[in-house]
Amino acid sequence: MDMLIYLTPICALIGLIFAGISYKNVRNEGEGNELIKKITAAIHGGAMVYLNRQYRAIAVFVVFIAIVLALVLPNGVLTAACFVFGAVLSATAGYAGMLTATIANGRTTNAATRGIGPAFKVSFASGTVMGMSVVGLGLFGLSLSFIILGNIYTDMDLFTLLNIIAGFSFGASSIALFARVGGGIFTKAADVGADLVGKVEAGIPEDDPRNPAVIADNVGDNVGDIAGMGADLYESYVGSIIATMLLAASTAAATFPGIPVMNVVMVPLVIAAVGILASVIGTFFVRTNKTESSAIHMAFNMGLIAAIVLTVIASYVVTGHLLGGYGLNVFFSTVAGLVAGFLIGQITEHYTSYDKKPTLTVAHSCQTGSATNVITGFAKGMESTLWPAVIISIAIYIAFQLAGLYGIAIAAVGMLATLGISLSVDAYGPVADNAGGIAEMSHQKKEVRQITDTLDAVGNTTAAMGKGFAIGSAALTALSLFASYAIAVGLTSIDVMNPNVFIGLIIGAMLPFLFSSMTILAVGNAAGEVVVEVRRQFKEIKGLMEGKADPDYSKCITISTHSALKEMIPPGILAVIAPILVGLVLGAGALGGLLAGSVVSGFMLAITMSNAGGSWDNAKKFIELGNFGGKGSDAHKAGVTGDTVGDPFKDTAGPAINILIKLMSIVALVFAPLFI
């Protein structure tokens, strides 16, 4: 085994050390006054209670699947061990990110009393813990599994060895599914419940401490957008690397004649390793003391561009060193993925930002009522699929022409190589959002709230861009895993003239819609319970509306937690059982059709829902700035309705589809021996 392979866990450890330093920096910040401490403790306590209960529930699933893997697969015990290892590290990353975010929010509010610079520093440092934990633990676990098993089982076929290690990605996918679905149900149940009764019925502002669901809403921001987003991208990161390694083992001899197969296998690991170093360096470019949101955007872009440029340079050196004359083709495939990821983020921003035409059109439609708002927003969401589809298609075409199926997979690795910093930027948003809520609830000065509002506005944009990036990376990762599955079962093409294959295609195209239905209905049911509870408290607690009595915040947290844990099980079972049943009943070709159908329909549906939801959200915010009558106007009420409809679209169903298409692909790959 080439000594260069040992670089990967070392770079991963550097990322983890940097995450530890960032955590220490957050802890060293002042906690604020007693009221800030009290609110922070309530949010932190609610988030950690939910996360602990969720992980206990997932542990049962993980143990059950591990036993099944050990019993039914060749090399099942090794696959089960990798599965558990991947699940544990994914859960650890989520725990680290959640722990940090829920102690950073109050500290960000307190830092905002000293100016935007200190507040920005604290919130971004918190995001950095999540970003670096995900890439550090993901690459460390994957490379360690490869090194240990490779050194022990020296006589094992390389493709077989890597198929065992694919269990690591399956473990990551399992955690991701429940974290995304459960977290999405929790956050939107609380959010919708708080908005419907608080804003629409009671007429009180957002983050008002009189609202019984306000703490649950803030807890949900962390549960969904920190732990959920982190697990989603951890899964894509790990899945893209293992898919590329599998394709290298199976196609290297034909695609790169004369190059040692191990060199081709190592390329994704080494690119991921240098991507971590580039991300760490990129964080030092994220600095600003200016109060304009454009300056904060510029600071983030400087960091992202620095990381991308460094990764491009390093990838050129790595591919040239490992692949010789073929290095340039693989290098340009990597760059195609990097550029595609960046462009999809920009397209998402265009469709969801309130200073761009699509969202302004949605905001304008609010003047004629809720119905026209919903119609226009949904239409714009569907329209927004055009350019991401074109961009992904061009990236796939370029990568395939340059390096075959391996090129497509390495494009996914390229897209995710700078995940360390891009996820840090995404994870900053919920902290800034919480800080604004805490500022409101702790009655801070207007200047402090303006600072947190500025940080939050930037966070909304970065979150929308992050969702677009997550969808694009999920599509490429799922396609790479699908290609690995096809090789594992000996499929050379998907013959749609074969009835079984066409049946699989139809079932696959249907599954994202059924899955979305289940998650959206779950949000509706859970939100209904929260609404009933909030109404009860406003009615029964005397003096609550006047601010003379405190609401029972814990009740709404308990309802949201119970609903999320109960409702996340059926979608999770569907995602695992569907590909296994189709493979066993209709055969490997039909399962190939299912995977192809789910990737195509899932990609389009996820973009539609995420961008429609983001557009409705920011159309409402545009009206709240004083446009079309401002807060309390009929246009604002229509905007709130659109935002409420969009909440489960953009924060529950849309993001969860990413995991569905990846999880079904990895399930098919891991269980491939059963379908041959």
UniProtKB/Swiss-Prot annotation:
Q: How does it assemble?
A: Homodimer.
Ways its activity is controlled: Requires K(+) for maximal activity. Inhibited by the Na(+) ionophore monensin, activated by the K(+) ionophore valinomycin and unaffected by the protonophore CCCP.
Mind listing the UniProt keywords for this protein, alphabetically? Calcium, Cell membrane, Ion transport, Magnesium, Membrane, Metal-binding, Potassium, Sodium, Sodium transport, Translocase, Transmembrane, Transmembrane helix, Transport
Residues binding Mg(2+) 1, per UniProt: D191, D195
At which positions is substrate bound? K188, K650
What is the gene called? hppA1
Matching Pfam families, A to Z?
H_PPase (PF03030)
Output one GO MF annotation: diphosphate hydrolysis-driven proton transmembrane transporter activity
Q: Where is this site: Important for potassium dependence?
A: A463
Q: What is this protein called?
A: K(+)-stimulated pyrophosphate-energized sodium pump
Query: What is the pH-activity profile?
Result: Optimum pH is 7.5.
A Gene Ontology cellular component where this protein is annotated is: plasma membrane
Return the similarity comment: Belongs to the H(+)-translocating pyrophosphatase (TC 3.A.10) family. K(+)-stimulated subfamily.
Q: Which domain of life is it from?
A: Archaea
Which organism is the protein's source? Methanosarcina mazei (strain ATCC BAA-159 / DSM 3647 / Goe1 / Go1 / JCM 11833 / OCM 88)
